[in-house]
């Protein structure tokens, strides 16, 4: 599920090393070489997810709560985000052409919105972007900060929809900044500024933004309290933060890199966190949550399946 609240791969050499005991003919190796059909890959994914859920739900209610509290405590001693260079290598510094072939027209690299009236991926992207604007209470003339702007789906949508707004977009990826800036030049948008910076080092002037929006970036964050303190400083009086984050209904856990089956943590989401739906409710010292919405995980399922169709087509 996801929740919303208002308040060719470039890698390092170590990233492509595989555990010595993993055979070239293991299921993981075969999947990486596209030698397995999607049906078998899905079966393996379901098995790994089921194993993780059994581990996280093991024991009684008290032990599950203690695990949750331990993760909460670890977040408070971490830097804002970890393994930011790995995230770039795994996702954000791939050539934009790959994403143009896989994603929709807006290049939205996050969940889209589907219902019985949604015709296709392009329409699903548009539906979710409109939903963000409604729930974040965006309006023309605002100064808006987007943290983790990706390939510019929301940034460019806002620039088009709100020509009198000033939009500051932040990404840790140079290719993403260059891509968005090129799109702005092509479309004549003069109201967008793109900053390339690691979120740990991002420095901005106080009390300048009416809105801060962040779409599926908080999953890369560990120290929510520290980041929310900074965001509170960047917001003007009366300003609001809107966050879209994928999550589990009840469980919170980091993606580890120490097991032979931890493919996701090692090669796709290093340093990432699976937050629980109520995680941000535990971090309201500097910003108070006014509203929270939950969306079914089927929206992401349909989005990912549409990406897969595009990828297979090309």
Residue ranges and their predicted role:
Residues 1-87:
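N-terminal accessory segments
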Residues 52-135, 139:
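Conserved Class I S-adenosyl-L-methionine-dependent methyltransferase catalytic core
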Residues 141-150:
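Conserved class I S-adenosyl-L-methionine
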Residues 151-163:
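Conserved SAM-binding loop of SAM-dependent methyltransferases across substrates and taxa
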Residues 186-201:
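Conserved SAM-binding strand-loop segment of SAM-dependent methyltransferases
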Residues 200-212:
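A short acidic, Gly/Pro-enriched loop at the edge of an enzyme's catalytic core
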Residues 225-240:
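A short glycine-rich, Lys/Arg-flanked "PGG" loop and its adjoining helix->strand segment in the class I
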Residues 247-249, 253-314:
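Substrate-binding/catalytic lobe of Class I Rossmann-like enzymes that use SAM or dcSAM, i.e.
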């Amino acid at each position: 599920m996801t929740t919303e609240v208002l308040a060719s791969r470039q890698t390092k050499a170590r990233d492509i090393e595989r555990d010595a005991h993993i055979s070239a003919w293991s299921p993981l190796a075969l999947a990486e070489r596209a030698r397995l059909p999607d049906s078998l890959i899905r079966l393996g994914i379901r098995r790994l997810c089921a194993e993780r859920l059994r581990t996280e739900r093991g024991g009684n209610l008290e032990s599950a709560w203690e695990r949750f509290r331990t993760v909460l405590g670890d977040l408070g001693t971490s830097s804002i985000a970890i393994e930011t260079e790995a995230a770039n290598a795994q996702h954000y510094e791939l050539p934009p052409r790959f994403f143009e072939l896989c994603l929709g027209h807006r290049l939205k690299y996050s969940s889209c919105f589907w219902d019985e009236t949604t015709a296709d991926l392009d329409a699903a992207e548009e539906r979710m972007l409109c939903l963000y604007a409604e729930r974040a209470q965006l309006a023309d003339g605002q100064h808006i900060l987007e943290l983790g702007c990706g390939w510019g789906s929301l940034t460019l949508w806002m620039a088009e929809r709100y020509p009198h707004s000033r939009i500051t977009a932040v990404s840790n990826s140079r290719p993403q900044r260059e891509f968005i800036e090129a799109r702005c030049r092509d479309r004549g948008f003069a109201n967008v500024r793109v900053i390339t910076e690691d979120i740990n080092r991002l420095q901005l002037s106080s009390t300048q933004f009416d809105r801060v929006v962040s779409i599926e970036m908080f999953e890369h964050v560990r120290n929510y309290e520290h980041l929310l303190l900074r965001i509170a400083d960047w917001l003007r009086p009366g300003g609001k933060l809107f966050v879209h984050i994928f999550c589990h209904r009840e469980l919170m856990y980091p993606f580890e890199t120490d097991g032979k089956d931890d493919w996701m943590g090692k090669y796709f989401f290093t340093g990432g966190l699976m937050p629980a739906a109520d995680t941000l409710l535990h971090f309201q010292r500097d910003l108070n949550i006014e509203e929270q919405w939950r969306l079914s995980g089927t929206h992401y399922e349909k989005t990912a399946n549409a990406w897969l169709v595009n990828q297979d087509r090309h």
